[in-house]
Amino acid sequence: LLENSQLVGNIGNPVLDKINLCSYSIIELSSFQLEKVKEIKLDFGVLVNIAPDHIDYHGSFSEYTKVKNRIRESKIATEESDPRKLWSIITDRDQRAVMNIKLSHLPHRYQHVLKHDQLTFCNDSKATNLAALKFALNQTSDPYTLILCGDPDKEKYDVFEISGPTKVYIFGKHAKEISEKVFH
């Protein structure tokens, strides 16, 4: 969307390896990075995804929220998450100019990996918390099967209702614990 730009940071491309290779760098900063950085000197900051996450590291949701809000130290800060509206804010150009551009999912983020007959397989392995899971589950109205694993100790919840999938398969080290908390 932005000519001569690159995606770097927590997305998997180290910032320091790519610095000054493009005119614009779109940097995904994790809460860990926001906590460690001394001073934020970003032209634009977008605050997204404040949901109970990494509480085991930050100690509390309040501390996690405080760290995530550091993005507001950018010259311009917004909570807008629609990529087309963001493009309009950043470039100061009308968002209608990009309405027909097809945006693709990032790897492992509700990524469509295979379509066979009437089955579509999506990889959402980056969805490591309930908020991300809820987002993914709301992306389709078609019948689907959910394959789920995770660490219930990373996020505190008593019970989690999943509506939508025709079947739910739970696997992994914590399968028994998760199956006791998830109902379908």
Positions of predicted regions on the chain:
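Residue-level signal for inorganic ion chemistry
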Residues: 10, 28, 48, 64, ...
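Walker A (P-loop) phosphate-binding motif
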Residues: 1-8
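Short, polar loop motifs at secondary-structure junctions
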Residues: 10-13, 29-33, 78-83, 172-177
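Short, conserved loop/helix-junction motifs that constitute active-site signature segments
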Residues: 38-41, 71-76, 139-141, 159-166, ...
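Nucleotide phosphate-binding/pyrophosphate-handling subdomain across enzymes
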Residues: 86, 90-165
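Flexible active-site lid/hinge loop adjacent to a nucleotide/diphosphate
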Residues: 21-81
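C-terminal helical cap/extension that packs against the catalytic core
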Residues: 152-184
